[in-house]
Amino acid sequence: MTNIRKTHPLMKILNDAFIDLPTPSNISSWWNFGSLLGLCLIMQILTGLFLAMHYTPDTSTAFSSVAHICRDVNYGWFIRYLHANGASMFFICLYAHIGRGLYYGSYMFQETWNIGVLLLLTVMATAFVGYVLPWGQMSFWGATVITNLLSAIPYIGTTLVEWIWGGFSVDKATLTRFFAFHFILPFIITALAAVHLLFLHETGSNNPTGIPSNMDMIPFHPYYTIKDILGALLLILTLLALTLFTPDLLGDPDNYTPANPLSTPAHIKPEWYFLFAYAILRSIPNKLGGVLALLLSILILIFIPMLQTSKQRSMMFRPFSQLLFWTLVADLLTLTWIGGQPVEHPYIIVGQLASILYFLLILVLMPTAGLIENKLLKW
């Protein structure tokens, strides 16, 4: 008799996705981040659900309800900090996952890649609206500054901003709708992640060499389930260390001050995982130009498959491209640092140079390196 997991309609789907899935035998730990993102998503939905049971999305009580969660709810402080730091872990895994895709040419699976870009945008939207909910100073002013960027859109900008606010400023209506968005978006992310996996399993996984591995596949279970469990344990260990020892390390002290529309914080900045984009936004001394650069800094990922000039898929055997890739990583770290600094002399020019280098690397230098490496193959 055939095993039930191969015959039952539901079990069969799970079996084909996580048990008998043919997987390249040589994928490295960089391929762990997909499953870690799944783990982060489940964890965020669960902690978020318990927080939503005690949170009130109203300007007069939101800040107090978060304080109430931390003080009066059993292990409320733990759930709250798991959720806040879980978002940071989510973005660390997300950026590592995208970096892996860029390095090894996984973007050549275009449907999977495009759904991935859509997932990134949705996760960023979720994190942004979520940051507004505690209704601290940085929540309020972050929401004001970022939503206000839409007013740069010609003709409809101002109307659009007031429509999103639900009034003439960030107020009760804004907070209520942001809570609604923050609740629904993770479920949309879950659905998109399922489609992401569906498209991936149409082609099978890429591998570090970028060479088709159809002749050398092994079953996902037990070989990669055990490897994923190790990754999951390391992720949980890091998250617990962060949550239990330094829960506020990645947060902003200003968010412990209740939102006050009459007092602007000295330095308005988003959470660390948006700082690179914020630095690109600030580096252009024009509102519309900055907004366009901000959008393009993320949407540029869609054009990556079209910018592939090399005959080789992966960067494994392409030293010039490797050098440029790690330069890009260093550039993004520089932008992240600049995004958190005040707008004054040395930082402004460094931010502008780093922003120019970001677009130059992706649009010009990397495709050129690919062409040069093609020439070198003939030597």
UniProtKB/Swiss-Prot annotation:
Membrane topology of this protein: Multi-pass membrane protein
InterPro entries: Cyt_b/b6_C, Cyt_b/b6_C_sf, Cyt_b/b6_N, Cytb/b6-like_sf, Cytochrome_b, Cytochrome_b_C_euk/bac, Cytochrome_b_N_euk/bac, Di-haem_cyt_TM
Main location, first listed in the record: mitochondrion
Transmembrane segments: 33-53, 77-98, 113-133, 178-198, 226-246, 288-308, 320-340, 347-367
Cofactor(s) the record lists: heme b
Free-text remark on how the cofactor is bound: Binds 2 heme b groups non-covalently.
Binding site for a ubiquinone: 201
Places the protein is found: Mitochondrion inner membrane
GO biological process: mitochondrial electron transport, ubiquinol to cytochrome c
Pfam families: Cytochrom_B_C, Cytochrome_B
Further remarks about this protein from its record: Heme 1 (or BL or b562) is low-potential and absorbs at about 562 nm, and heme 2 (or BH or b566) is high-potential and absorbs at about 566 nm.
UniProt name for this protein: Cytochrome b
Species per Swiss-Prot/TrEMBL record: Delphinus capensis tropicalis (Arabian common dolphin)
Phylogenetic placement of the source organism: Eukaryota, Metazoa, Chordata, Craniata, Vertebrata
